[in-house]
Each structure stands twice: as structure tokens, then as C-alpha cells.
Amino acid sequence: MLALLAASVALAVAAGAQDSPAPGSRFVCTALPPEAVHAGCPLPAMPMQGGAQSPEEELRAAVLQLRETVVQQKETLGAQREAIRELTGKLARCEGLAGGKARGAGATGKDTMGDLPRDPGHVVEQLSRSLQTLKDRLESLEHQLRANVSNAGLPGDFREVLQQRLGELERQLLRKVAELEDEKSLLHNETSAHRQKTESTLNALLQRVTELERGNSAFKSPDAFKVSLPLRTNYLYGKIKKTLPELYAFTICLWLRSSASPGIGTPFSYAVPGQANEIVLIEWGNNPIELLINDKVAQLPLFVSDGKWHHICVTWTTRDGMWEAFQDGEKLGTGENLAPWHPIKPGGVLILGQEQDTVGGRFDATQAFVGELSQFNIWDRVLRAQEIVNIANCSTNMPGNIIPWVDNNVDVFGGASKWPVETCEERLLDL
């Protein structure tokens, strides 16, 4: 535009210089296209109007008008460029959201940001087309975005598939939880059954132990059992339930097998209030076997610490304190003045395997019997020698008339136990 204006001004000045018009002549300035400048075509004379402006003023006014037009066009171009930049930014964002699809289409389209034509009308038209193109592309991208959201093959379907997958996982989880609950219930039932079985077994064992301790176990016959005292302690012992009446004579017989040496300990003891050693048979340390009556002592010539079964009998009478000692049916010793004229006091406690320091208690482990006892019988008279022989050689089974050896009359404590005993003949073979 500025070049066109300069050409017009130069043409007018040249014409004025050549023609040298007379004073008062007028010139008209007309905008010509670029090709008319070089053609050299003369311009028609324009009639002059009275009172018109001078050529300089008209030229100045035209220049100002053209300048204003240029400024307006610059402002329009600036506004259009700003709009283009804004739309281009939106387009870039939309193309980014569309995953690059619109960018591919835009790359093959026309470049709307190239050099602009110099004609203002063309510029405006070109800008309008560019804006329309940008709007169309923006609408296309928005349409694609809406299609992406609503299209059944993309996110919506993915969301549905995800929901289905989550539902399937939830059902699997519920099934697994149900299986775990079933396994837990089954395990609880098995545990309960196992616990009940264990408790039943323990109860049976406890009942068996109780029966053994109380002597309620069944043997071939009531006297076919033995008491086992395997350790030298102060808590393993047997107890005769019945007590003794007042006695002026007695015979005590038993079978024993000692497992300790030296000293078999105390096979039995009878204590009454005021006298813990009313009747005691004991072998302590390297001392010989002793019979105590009312704490009076008689040494017996018996030897039973070889670990074999032996049949032992002792007799006593208050008359002159006479006593006898038999081993395996043979009389090995006799004596007198053992607590003469002293009756055996009634109501005491008869213990197997321990020596009593008080009635029924205060046992001393060093005096405990270790081994097995059986056929412990007490009579209230002195048995004849032949009777003792017959008992010892298994010819006669004669229970004591005061204390018989029967299962329900013997309790065991502290780990002592009752077991079936060997037959009398088997014990004889062990002599």
C-alpha cells in the first residue's frame, strides 16, 4: 500500500514539472493499480470545483486516510492472529486428547499460517477461511471426543468389561471365602473330635490309673496281684484299708522280691497314735533285717536281697515276747523278750513299702522298700510250722483271718502300681 501511494505522488510531481501549468491550475491525485504506473496512460482531466483544497492539503489528507487504513488493517491482523493463536492452542490440546488422530489429518491439510496476501480483502477472506477451517477441525475433534466417550468399543465397553471382571472376581472371592469357612468348620469339627478323642483317652487312662491306685482292676483271682514299688522315694507306697484289732499274738507272711542292695528297706510298718513303730519289718543299710514291736528290736537271720522271690513269715506272742522267723518255709531264727506282755494296739495304719515316723506319714526315702510285694496276710495267732511250709511251697492257699491279701483291700499311691503276679509255682522256680 505504501508503494502504491509513493508512485502516485511521484507521478503527479513529474507531470507538474513537465507541463509547467499556469498559476491557479489544479491536480487530481488518483490511486492507480501497480501496472498502470508503468503503462504511462494519461489520466483524464478532472474538473476543478470552486473552493476546493490545495493539492498539498488533498495529498496530506489522502496520506492520513491511507495511514489510518493501514493502522486499522494492522489492528485487524493482530486481532485475527491472536484469535488464530488461541484457536491453534485449543486445536493442539484437542489433538493431544484425540491421541494424535487429528494431527495426522492436519499434517496433510493446507498450511493456513503461510504468507498472507497483500490485498486487505484477500487477507480478511483468507483469515475467515482459516478461522472456519480451525473451527471445523475443532468441531471434528470435539465430535471424535464425544464419539470416544460414547463409542461402545472403547471406554464405555471397557468399563462394562471391567465391571464384569470385577463381578467375576467378587464371585470368585466369595466362593473362596465360603470354601475357607467350610474348611474352618471342618477343621473345627476335626479338632473337636480329636480333642474329644484325646479327652476320652485321657479319661480312660485316668480311670485306669485310678482303678490301679484303688485296686479296682480285675485279676484272675482277688489275690493274684502284686504291688510294684520301682523307686526309692518317700512317696511311693501301698496302704491296707483295714486296720488291726488289739492283738496278743500274730503271724505275718508275705512274698517279696527286692531290687535294692544293700538293705531292702521297709516291706511293711504299722503305726498307732503315740507309737510309730508298733510293728515294723526293716533292713536299713548294712544292718540285718529287724523286727520292731512297740519300738523294741529283734534281729532276724533272713537274707532276701538277691533280687529273687522269697517267702517270709514272722510270728510273735505277747507271752514272754516269743518270736520266730521263716524264709521259704524254713525256720531260720527264734527268740524271746520282744515286747513281752504288750498287746498290739488297734486302730493304726498299715503301710506297704515305707517306714512311718508318724501315723500314715513322714516317710524317709532311705528306708523305703524297692521291689515287689504280694500275698501279704495277717493272722491273729501263731501258725504252726507245717502250715507255714504248706503256704511257702504252694500246697495251701490260706488267707489271713485278720488282713487277707485281696485286691479291694489295697490302695497304691505316688506311682506305685498293681500288676498280675506270677503263679506260686513260678515264684518257687525263682528261688
Swiss-Prot record:
One of its GO terms (molecular function) is carbohydrate binding. GO terms for biological process: associative learning; chemical synaptic transmission. Residues 1-15 form the signal peptide. Its main location: secreted. Its cofactor is Ca(2+). Keywords: Calcium, Disulfide bond, Glycoprotein, Lectin, Metal-binding, Secreted, Signal. Residues 223-424 form the Pentraxin (PTX) domain. Ca(2+) 1 binds at N277, E355, Q356, D357. Homooligomer or heterooligomer (probably pentamer) with neuronal pentraxin receptor (NPTXR). This is Neuronal pentraxin-2.
